[in-house]
C-alpha cells in the first residue's frame, strides 16, 4: 500500500526541545551510498573486485515557504549562518499518523502510530528564493552525518482476518 506525502511533518530536536518546521513543501533525506573498497590483487587480469565500504552521507534538502515570523525558519537560518558545527536530529513523520515526537531529558520518543525517518546533520545553507508571482521559499540544505533510520508504523492489533 502506498502512502501520501500530504500530511508529512518535519521536526528537529534543537536546544533540548522538539520543534516542528511548518511550511514544508518538499523534503528529500538524501542518500548514504556505500564507498567501494578495492580488493583486487595482482593475479586478477580481467576485472577489479570490490567490497562494500563505509557510507558517505549526502545532503538532505527541505524546501519551505520561508516566513520571517516563523521561529523555526529563523532558527534554521541562524543555524546555517552560525560559526558552530552543532549537529541537530531531524525527524520526518509520515502521513500515516499525526502524533508528534516527544522529548524528556534529551531522549526523543517517536510514537509507534506513525512511520518515521530520522537522521542527524547540520544546517549548511538557507538560501532565499524570490520570484515573480510566488511565495518566498528556501531550499534548506542539511549535511547528514551518519546513517538514517527508518521506523515503520506498528500495525494496529486486533484487526484479524
Regions found by a protein language model. Give the residues of each.
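Short conserved beta-strand and strand-loop elements enriched in small hydrophobics
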Residues: 12, 86-95, 108-110
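Solvent-exposed edge beta-strands and adjacent loop segments
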Residues: 1-68, 120-136
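Short beta-strand and beta-hairpin "edge-sheet" elements
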Residues: 96-150
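Intrinsically disordered, low-complexity terminal/linker regions enriched in Pro/Ser/Gly
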Residues: 154-161
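Short, conserved charged micro-motifs
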Residues: 69-76
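Residue-level detector of buried hydrophobic side-chain packing
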Residues: 62, 88-90, 142
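Soluble sensory domains of the PAS superfamily and closely related sensory modules
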Residues: 79-85
Amino acid at each position: 500500500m502506498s502512502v501520501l506525502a500530504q500530511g508529512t511533518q518535519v521536526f528537529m530536536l534543537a536546544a533540548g526541545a522538539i520543534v516542528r518546521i511548518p511550511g514544508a513543501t518538499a523534503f528529500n533525506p538524501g542518500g548514504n551510498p556505500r564507498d567501494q573498497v578495492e580488493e583486487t590483487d595482482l593475479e586478477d587480469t580481467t576485472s577489479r573486485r570490490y567490497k562494500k565500504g563505509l557510507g558517505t552521507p549526502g545532503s538532505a534538502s527541505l524546501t519551505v515557504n520561508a516566513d520571517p515570523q516563523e521561529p523555526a525558519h529563523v532558527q534554521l537560518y541562524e543555524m546555517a549562518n552560525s560559526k558552530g558545527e552543532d549537529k541537530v536530529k531531524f525527524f520526518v513523520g509520515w502521513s500515516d499518523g499525526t502524533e508528534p515526537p516527544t522529548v524528556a531529558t534529551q531522549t526523543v520518543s517517536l510514537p509507534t502510530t506513525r512511520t518515521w525517518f530520522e537522521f542527524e546533520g547540520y544546517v549548511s545553507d538557507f538560501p532565499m528564493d524570490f520570484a515573480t508571482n510566488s511565495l518566498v521559499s528556501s531550499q534548506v540544505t542539511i549535511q547528514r552525518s551518519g546513517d538514517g533510520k527508518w521506523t515503520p508504523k506498528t500495525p494496529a492489533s486486533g484487526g484479524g482476518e
